[in-house]
């Protein structure tokens, strides 16, 4: 692995802004309402098999870079908190976190002590892009909650969006577990009607977002993660949660493209997920700093750093004026 690129320089983007020319200060309501991804049905066998084939062809396990786990947790926590604030769909937050992970694997950022603002800026830009891909009502860039220590102007967020788009080669339509949820649920719940379908889908979505704090988008194929979260969400009793390889194979045995390789990958991810859940129950959750509203103005209020593209290459500690 090479030397880390200058994290500040990474956020200087020279792309044209013409493709992101919306009014950044206003909420946009799109006429092409986006539908949730878990609309796949049991009749879509060929469609799902094609998705799996694409995943298998494109999948590449990428090594972890040096971005600290605490920095990543803070970023994910902000994305999840902001999702709730705006009422975004679960898949919008998941896609934002996926953009975040993919970007960091392609452009490793070695943060210095006073450069944690770069992770927050990346979080804002990733969620904004995901909202533009998934949501019908898209907030303006100035409406995203800001940290009390610094403020990002819309132009800076838009330039970071362009950097993300360029880094990901403009491939923003990701295959996610949401494409598979209905399909797997139909396959594994044929003999279990004790848990409602809507409840299982909600459990799967909640479990998936919680799992993003432990597992990166780049570690597993998305159908593997979908199969595991659906298995756990559809369990009606604690005895259902400890499945063997053979029991998992039986759950998915009716799927034409399911092989021993798929079964092994799902089993290993399943075991890891159970270990994560057990560890959570044994260990108190760490305190993660989350974004709060700026304090009221007054003599005791902390001054906020303001970021715009005119002084973006300057050290954050020197940018004390609000422009």
From Swiss-Prot:
Keyword tags: Cell cycle, Cell division, Cyclin
InterPro entries for the chain: Cyclin (IPR039361), Cyclin-like_dom (IPR013763), Cyclin-like_sf (IPR036915), Cyclin_N (IPR006671)
Keyword hit for Cell cycle: yes
CDD domains registered for this protein in UniProt: CYCLIN_AtCycD-like_rpt1, CYCLIN_AtCycD-like_rpt2
Coiled-coil positions: none
A Pfam short name: Cyclin_N
GO cellular component terms listed in the entry, alphabetical order: nucleus
Annotated spans, Disordered: 17-36, 281-323
Domain of life: Eukaryota
Keyword Transport assigned: no
GO biological process: cell division; DNA endoreduplication
Family: Belongs to the cyclin family. Cyclin D subfamily.
Listed PANTHER family: CYCLINS (PTHR10177)
Name of the protein: Cyclin-D5-1
Species in which this protein is naturally found: Arabidopsis thaliana
Gene that produces this protein: CYCD5-1
